[in-house]
């Protein structure tokens, strides 16, 4: 699989964040994992207000990114909607029900990663 240029990966992660915000996601956070992990470049973490909201947000992100030419490689948790993982290889999206996000605290687990907050336009702050 060809490697995606770093600036394109960043733009895709920002676009995914913007799509989550379009769907009224809460606490949208982008973690830059490049200095601390070879697994992926970014984690995008966001919360929905209910299982239905989380599922709908995941479907919205997948559909919009697919229309723009980026296909998800692996999906987990879509049926339940409590924690949906969308793996795009260079970035991974974690969409949580708030109680599970609080329980797993991925931001704490990856505390060595740079935390990049995202504003309503999807631009990095």
How should each PLM-predicted stretch be described?
Residues 86-88:
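Active-site beta-strand termini and strand-to-loop segments that position acidic
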């Amino acid at each position: 699989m060809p490697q995606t240029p770093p600036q394109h990966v960043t733009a895709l992660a920002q676009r995914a964040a913007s799509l989550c915000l379009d769907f009224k996601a809460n606490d949208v956070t982008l973690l830059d994992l490049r200095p601390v992990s070879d697994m992926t470049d970014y984690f995008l973490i966001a919360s929905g207000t209910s299982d239905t909201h989380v599922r709908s947000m995941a479907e919205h992100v997948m559909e919009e990114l697919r229309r723009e030419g980026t296909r998800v490689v692996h999906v987990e948790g879509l049926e339940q909607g409590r924690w949906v993982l969308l793996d795009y290889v260079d970035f991974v999206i974690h969409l949580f029900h708030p109680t599970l996000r609080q329980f797993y605290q991925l931001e704490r687990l990856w505390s060595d990663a740079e935390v990049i907050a995202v504003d309503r336009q999807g631009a990095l702050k």
